[in-house]
Amino acid sequence: MKQKCVLIITDGIGYNKNSKFNAFEAAKKPSYEKLFKEVPNSLLKTSGLAVGLPEGQMGNSEVGHMCIGSGRIIYQNLVRINKAIENKELEKNENLKKLLAKCKRVHIIGLYSDGGVHSMDTHFKAMLEICAKNGNEVFAHAITDGRDVSPKSGLNFIKDLKEFCENLGVHFATLCGRFYAMDRDKRWDRVKEYYECLLGKAYKVPNLLEYLQKSYDENVTDEFIKAAQNENYKGMREEDGIIFINFRNDRMKQLVEVLNSKDFKEFEREKIFENLLTMSVYDDKFKLPVLFEKEKIENTLAQVISKAGLSQLHTAETEKYAHVTFFFNGGKEELLENETRVLIPSPKVKTYDEKPQMSAFEVCDAVKKGIEKGEDFIVVNFANGDMVGHTGDFNATIKAVEAVDTCLGEILECAKKHDYAFIITSDHGNCEAMQDEKGNLLTNHTTFDVFVFVQARGVSKIKDNMGLSNIAASVLKILDLEIPKEMNEALF
């Protein structure tokens, strides 16, 4: 069976038997049609307990790539935090107790929705309650979502938060869309707007809930809400404590850097803050206390390949680069021996419906070069189905799928020419359900299964009831390497 192998992750493309508002079904996709006819294929589970999330919880890119790259189900921070709240362990956390003892005033910052991708509203409320009951003066800073949940669901979430704050005696201080507060692509002008809001220098309003409704009236949805503050909020003081409740790291790193880093040079800052506490490890370079330390994941797919002396290439465009490197490698930043990484910049557009092909063709070229060079293993992510799917633009998402299909055709032709095996799958769904029955836009991930295709010598059938955690062992089997005991079985 021994063959070199390409693993292609088509982000956000899932299987939905309903063809209505299904951008995958609506797209012209000759490469996929060929795959369905000629290559062994099946469906994989990408949500809930199959990827270490609560039952019924949609999967996401971080969880999906970690599951694929580690070859096992890792119980995610969302599940760990839920358990810590249920059994009252969170309030006993030593780092939390230290911060609350040191700082009279405490600010809670995070994405406020039940999307479960970056955060959970229940975690936000639990933290507000712990801090308020401890006697601290508490300020809530809600970031509106509209991406992992529907675009105007924020009104109900923020109404809920406002009432919760009033009942607890907590200040509801600021409101801002994730487009600004949670940028991850070094668009510092966006983060600066939110930083200034936290300092009390933003647009002042008497009622943040009414401000949100007014934004809707002006066709601005949750993701894009401009930073605003309650008129009574006077801003953060340098001695205040700041707690970040997002458990996913990639969209909080820039904000933490702005608030805390002494070496930050992107724009002038009036204040920097020392008393920060993050829900999880956002970046090893931040020497900050955390509530939930990361679990050590050993014997990942990338590690096994590296230890065997084989070469590997990891490539994606900016939006998904962290997923094929940090998350795929089990939450480790360091480059492994014989590992090459190729980052393709994502296009500089406001939203990706403006350029649905994104940088897919450049990513495709990087893969073909890797095959021609003879890399033993290549992992690539095509971001289009997910990132354009998040915009809610159906026609643009059809074009996104068609761009991915074109790239698949080119890669598979190149793979065949150089005798490479390939596995194609997705980390989760998105573009296959763009509206609900009532015609409301769906911009979030789905809980649908995803396709998997395996073309390798000796493989004629894929086992039933498999998941993302079965892919790593499959790659090792193709490469003829020993499968570590920590990994789940192969797909075939």
Curated annotation (Swiss-Prot):
A Pfam family hit: iPGM_N
Organism of origin: Campylobacter jejuni subsp. jejuni serotype O:2 (strain ATCC 700819 / NCTC 11168)
HAMAP family recorded: GpmI
Cofactor(s) this protein cannot do without: Mn(2+)
Pathway stated in the Swiss-Prot or TrEMBL entry: Carbohydrate degradation; glycolysis; pyruvate from D-glyceraldehyde 3-phosphate: step 3/5
Name recorded for this polypeptide: 2,3-bisphosphoglycerate-independent phosphoglycerate mutase
Catalytic activity: (2R)-2-phosphoglycerate = (2R)-3-phosphoglycerate
GO CC, one annotated term: cytosol
Gene Ontology molecular function: any one: manganese ion binding
